[in-house]
Amino acid sequence: MLGVSLGARLLRGVGGRRGQFGARGVSEGSAAMAAGESMAQRMVWVDLEMTGLDIEKDQIIEMACLITDSDLNILAEGPNLIIKQPDELLDSMSDWCKEHHGKSGLTKAVKESTVTLQQAEYEFLSFVRQQTPPGLCPLAGNSVHADKKFLDKHMPQFMKHLHYRIIDVSTVKELCRRWYPEDYEFAPKKAASHRALDDISESIKELQFYRNNIFKKKTDEKKRKIIENGETEKPVS
């Protein structure tokens, strides 16, 4: 009897530990899955400064990158690189580019830089690989469709890591300007420094404004109308 009792106790002990290990494994697996889903919701914010907008002849001279979560909280600040370009290209820029890039100090910084386009792509690709899963997170920015053209051409490996969709703040801006002009009047004004990192920060703040003052407000109004009409709010499918 003693042997059976001891054996039973031993089996129960092993089974209990297995149960604990199994529960821990499920818990850790769920946490990992939740973390993966959260990372998939991140946004890759990019801003470029170029020598112009002609995709056939102009080049990238500055690039910055920030990562936010879906609520627009900044999670990581990536490289902010000045990319070397030949003096002939800088000399052939439009008067607008010469004025603004000269005033901001960017033209001088480009002439002094030793960073190549290939080195820049490697740095940015390494950064986004650390912060986002492949193929799931969209490119975000202001008029970012223009940046995307240059990135597709000059940094294809970087772009392959991102989702094919984009989040363009300028689209939201133009819709709000037309649909909610009273609210749009209070949108944050851009300082127009024409430096990549400053422009990204301004774009994030601008989208935060639209989210907090227009998207949220309209959602709250809809909920109030549903309650006033005595309707049951339908769950989102």
UniProtKB/Swiss-Prot annotation:
BP terms from Gene Ontology: nucleobase-containing compound metabolic process
Subcellular location, record wording: Mitochondrion intermembrane space; Mitochondrion matrix; Mitochondrion; Cytoplasm
Residue positions where N6-acetyllysine is found in the record: 173
Transit peptide start and end: 1-25
Key words, A-Z: Acetylation, Cytoplasm, Exonuclease, Hydrolase, Magnesium, Manganese, Metal-binding, Mitochondrion, Nuclease, Nucleus, Phosphoprotein, Transit peptide
Sequence ranges assigned to domain Exonuclease in this UniProt record: 43-207
Cellular component, GO annotation: focal adhesion; mitochondrial intermembrane space; mitochondrial matrix; mitochondrion; nucleolus; nucleus
Phosphotyrosine: modified positions: 122
Molecular functions per Gene Ontology: 3'-5' exonuclease activity; 3'-5'-DNA exonuclease activity; 3'-5'-RNA exonuclease activity; magnesium ion binding; nucleic acid binding
Primary residence: mitochondrion
Phenotype seen when the gene is deleted: Causes embryonic lethality before E8.5. Heart- and skeletal-muscle-specific knockout mice show elevated concentrations of the RNA dinucleotide pApA in the mitochondria purified from the heart.
EC number(s) from the headed UniProt entry: 3.1.15.-
Entry cofactors: Mn(2+); Mg(2+)
Phosphoserine carried by residues: 92
InterPro entries in UniProt: Exonuclease_RNaseT/DNA_pol3 (IPR013520), Oligoribonuclease (IPR022894), RNaseH-like_sf (IPR012337), RNaseH_sf (IPR036397)
Gene3D superfamilies: Ribonuclease H-like superfamily/Ribonuclease H (3.30.420.10)
Domain of life according to the entry: Eukaryota
Binding site for Mg(2+) 1: 47, 49, 199
Xref: Pfam families: RNase_T
Binding site for Mg(2+) 2: 47, 147
Family note: Belongs to the oligoribonuclease family.
Subunit record text: Homodimer. Homotetramer.
Functional summary from the UniProt entry: 3'-to-5'exoribonuclease that preferentially degrades DNA and RNA oligonucleotides composed of only two nucleotides. Binds and degrades longer oligonucleotides with a lower affinity. Plays dual roles in mitochondria, scavenging nanoRNAs (small RNA oligonucleotides of <5 nucleotides) that are produced by the degradosome and clearing short RNAs that are generated by RNA processing. Essential for correct initiation of mitochondrial transcription, degrading mitochondrial RNA dinucleotides to prevent RNA-primed transcription at non-canonical sites in the mitochondrial genome.
Protein name (database record): Oligoribonuclease, mitochondrial
Gene: Rexo2
